[in-house]
Amino acid sequence: MGRDKALIEIDGSAMIERAAISLATANLEPIRIAVAQPEDVEEYGSAIGPDLDIEWVLDSITHAGPIDAIEEALLDPECEDGLLQLATVDYPWASSDLFFSLQDMLGADDCLIMPHDGERGHPLLSLIRTKEVLEIIEGDRRPLRVQFAEARHSVLVEDPAILLNVNTPADLE
């Protein structure tokens, strides 16, 4: 791509900052941000600013992908037997309202709740039960969309504009 999408600015804020502020506003601090290399901490940290409670986690396998990063997070003892809100910088319009709605709508028997835009699910914005989802994804490298659809889950239908996935500045045009 050539440019780090986390640092693409929308309305004067980097996409990583927008994601972190939305999570913090939804009372989801500390926010754990996985980075590929130590230099990313300084660069992303300066884009986010010092006011949020951020825990930086270095990927054990550089650029391994979201499934490995999620599995690694779920293996952390601090994440066991609880809830974890997944979020990526790819969704700059995901707001605290979305995260609150996911919290409110998660069913008692659900392993997760996934936002849906009417055409497809968005697993990287799911609210997950850590123990159950670890059992689902551990060692399975099929797409998360497939794995999560097979799990006991709820769907939160959301405005497609909120779930617009941005990977390059051209996606904003």
What are these regions (language model features)?
Residues 173:
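Acidic two-metal-ion nuclease catalytic site recognized across multiple nuclease folds
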Residues 1-122, 130, 135-141, 149-162, ...:
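Nucleotide and nucleotide-moiety/phosphate-recognizing core
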